[in-house]
Amino acid sequence: MSVESELKKEGIVVTSILSSSKVNSIARKVANILATSFPEHKFNTEELYILLSQIPMYRASVPKGFSEANYLYKNCSIYFNENIPTKELTTYAVHECIHYLQTRKDKWGNLLKLGLCDLTRFNVHGLGINEAAVQYATSVALGSTLDTVKYYGITFDTISPNCYPLVCNLIAQMAYITGEYVLLDSTFNSKDD
């Protein structure tokens, strides 16, 4: 399916392309956020900036209930809801830029891995857990603090009360067991550690 068909199927309509200067500004800020938030991963801020500045970014009309930003792996692009204030784009870009960093394709452009998600088998494995790991990393990077929430009659603390709160809590428990470095290294670099 073509990119245009994929967008149409999802109800995403591109309304504008972000200027090079805006993309560069977002890329610079996200690179700084990731490098300073995860020093143990030894991100090179300048290399990360150069990589992230290559991402095509768009404003789009998106259906109600969709995320405010969406990463489309087929064309390695980010689509921001046109209703997001410009000053908030970087906040939403962090999550999608992590998806960009974790994308692994074969020489024909077929997606093989996306962080903890393995697409090399007949069935997709780890998609939900990868999304939660990316949201956990995003919350850490943005300096989110624990908040108490109640879902399904369960009260618990989570670093991400509005986005995947229960699964982010599970990711935090996994990070406690494996060590946060190992979990996030696998998430950022699509490793099987």
What are these model-predicted stretches?
Residues 117-166, 174:
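Post-HExxH zinc-binding segment in Zn-dependent metallohydrolases
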Residues 10-87, 107:
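Auxiliary, metal-adjacent structural segments of Zn-dependent hydrolase domains
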Residues 5-9, 14, 154-193:
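Pan-zinc metallopeptidase signature
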